[in-house]
Amino acid sequence: MRQIMLFEQGISPTPIVKMSGGYGENQYYIKREDMIPFSFGGNKARKAAEFYKEIRACGVDVVMTYGSNSSNHCRIIANMVASMGIACHIISPEENRERLYNTRLVEDFGATVETCPVTEVSGTIDRRMEAFRQAGRNPYFIMGGGHGNPGTRACVNTYREIAAYEEQAGISFDYIFHASGTGTTQAGLVSGKLLADAEKREKGKPADGLKIVGVSIARNEERGREVVRQSIEDYLGARYAELYRDEELIFTDEYCMGGYGKYTPEVAQTIEEVMKSDGIPMDTTYVGKAFYGMRRYAAAHGLRGRNILFIHTGGTPLYFDFLERQNL
């Protein structure tokens, strides 16, 4: 099993920069997780680095995961596993078979893609894992989107990077916004804040007033909040009852636009605006949709003069899918 030196050395903090465009009556900053130097970057690369450690430790010879044809997670896991020199098997819903850039990359990395109806995903995963074991293989399964404690831990580190930037730059963010899909990113950010606030209280300092807002790209609020809360509980373990504050979990489904992958002309306009003003590519499924939702949320809640950080969670290949659709 080959090493990936970036993951062996550890991922360096990603840059935070003030945005140039006029996006409303607040000061907007962006954390460029898309600049992590592996497979087009993104928070999925940060999560993959955590799964990499477990895979190396367990002597795995095949990695399984789940995701759609547009999945950034599947692209990065397929790339990571190819770099390690072991097999990758992806379960994907047959309902989404348009050949996107992420689809092509997954194929180029040599992953086997097995499709099934979305209603049969769970059973297909179980059967395939058992088939690998019966064949004498040592499979390792990663939940869709990098869901689970390794992924949450990766995003706790994201929060710590943000806190370190605030201290170094002499700035305090009032809000953090990001795209919320499987919920792991938000679980990590909120867990990081809860742990940091507990340390401050122990030192007699006030907790941070920062609000973390997950902009749902698919799930309704009830389901989305519960998945994030459960991930926080799983990660904090015995400290959950002591640390968790329900008001810290802000999840909005007001900008889902009908579900996963759905978007409006206003989202497309936002993506074009950000590219022209700041030179930053976004996409219609995750980041561009969430950035648009952030601006609408800020206007609806009367936010003015605030320091707002948006986390660019990656997905550059999807930007080129967007360009192709715009040129049809």
Question: What positions do the PLM features span?
Answer:
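PLP-dependent amino-acid enzyme catalytic core
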Residues: 1-328
